[in-house]
């Protein structure tokens, strides 16, 4: 599910957090909890969770860094919503129907650091570096995130991407679709609700 009505918002703005909170609330209510929400920023995760505190009728668990305790608590709860970042993109599995909705809040592009800067200097142009390094890194991490909820052909899960860059006219839509297995696509929340009801 990649919503058709995603607007580009200023990174770190209240508008960004409010738009995401609204999308997440609608998805969580459609799937009656059972949701893993993956963030690329702890700050954004905290801001969105604050906005949702009184809007979601299901228990919410937030993982800061790699808290095995919180993950174990989520796994024991019914209908819970887990907000996570960092290491939860890989290495933590939620098999079967434990997670019926996986929400990827932003495309997982690497944060620039001295290593990436050194790599960047090996390419003639920024565009070449983005296509050869940045995009493949994002695709790999996106597949890892996708794999948190869908491990086998028997697993079913709504996977939502709430980044406008993956939407219909978004800059990275083709790269996102190339990274993931072929799936039934949806752009409206009603289609998600129909899919959940049909399971």
Where are the regions that the model predicts?
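ASCE RecA-like P-loop NTPase motor cores
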Residues: 1-199
């Amino acid at each position: 599910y990649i919503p058709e009505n995603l607007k580009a918002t200023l990174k770190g703005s209240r508008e960004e957090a409010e738009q995401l909170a609204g999308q997440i609330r609608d998805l969580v209510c459609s799937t009656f909890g059972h949701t893993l929400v993956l963030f690329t920023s702890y700050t954004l995760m905290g801001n969105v969770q604050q906005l949702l505190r009184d809007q979601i009728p299901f228990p919410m668990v937030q993982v800061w860094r790699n808290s095995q305790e919180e993950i174990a608590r989520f796994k024991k709860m019914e209908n819970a919503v887990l907000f996570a970042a960092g290491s939860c993109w890989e290495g933590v599995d939620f098999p079967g129907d434990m997670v019926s909705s996986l929400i990827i809040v932003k495309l997982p592009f690497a944060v620039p650091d001295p290593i990436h800067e050194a790599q960047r200097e090996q390419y003639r142009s920024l565009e070449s570096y983005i296509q050869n390094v940045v995009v493949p890194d994002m695709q790999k991490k996106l597949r890892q995130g996708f794999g948190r909820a869908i491990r086998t052909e028997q697993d079913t899960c709504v996977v939502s991407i709430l980044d406008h860059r993956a939407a219909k006219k978004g800059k990275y839509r083709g790269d996102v679709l190339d990274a993931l297995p072929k799936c039934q696509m949806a752009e409206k929340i009603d289609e998600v609700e129909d899919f959940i009801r049909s399971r």
